[in-house]
Amino acid sequence: MNEIASNNIPLKWDVFVAKRQGISRDLPPGKEQLMWVAGSSTLIYGVRDAVLVDTQLTIDHNRALAAWIAKSGKNLTTIYITHGHADHFFGIAELKSLFPNAKAVATPTAVKVMHRQGSPEYLAKFWTPRYPGQLPANPMFAEELKSKVIQLEGHELAPIELGHTDTDHTTCLHVPSIGLVVAGDAAYNDIHLYLAESNEQGRREWIAALDTIEALKPRTVIAGHKVPERDDDPRIIEETRQYIRDFDELARTSDTARELYDRMLELYPNRANPGSLWSSAHAAKG
């Protein structure tokens, strides 16, 4: 657990990380030991109450997440979803079955993305074939957040609009009293970025989003996808930014998706989930 005193009342946070199989599985041979992705869910809590940032994807991982929260003994008041990708909100129903009074909220634009991701058509086309029997049949969606901040025992938790990062209409959650940013997928921590939804303009917008996070001067930055053993140092802001710059440069000077993929692996040989890079390379080069 991590603790920093603020206004004589300690706020704390802890991070639940679960590994699963990545989305892209048709990539070239090699790097088999790295063909996994890990998603993070962050619990921010005070003396009695707690706020969760992002859920997990699969039923089993969300049951484990719910049990982990219950073990903390805290009263879960809010589930904040940073953006509309399914692996960040498909656990809402599972969590509410154990914490029925918790409200799941997100920004209005993020809620719209959720409804696309969780539609029967998108489930049948994209998610269910990749994770058969592992996902909720009828995902529950977040409600639109009506206020500018979330209150937690006298502390303000502020959603920050970031625009496009690994998808459209993303946010982070800033807790200024403890110097914490829960970055969602705006920052990655030793895992290949998902750039398949980001064209050249989108990548510029993602860098601008990282500048926005950096301007908050956080002491801790929790990435939506992180290697469990890695710490949450703010250096991951620049690491993510440099990865995008490198991808941009190599995308301009590579002729094929395979060439771009191989050249990025030369720069980043040890990052987890090369399948994400494979998808990104194909989106950039066809």
Regions found by a protein language model. Give the residues of each.
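Zn-dependent metallo-beta-lactamase
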Residues: 1-48
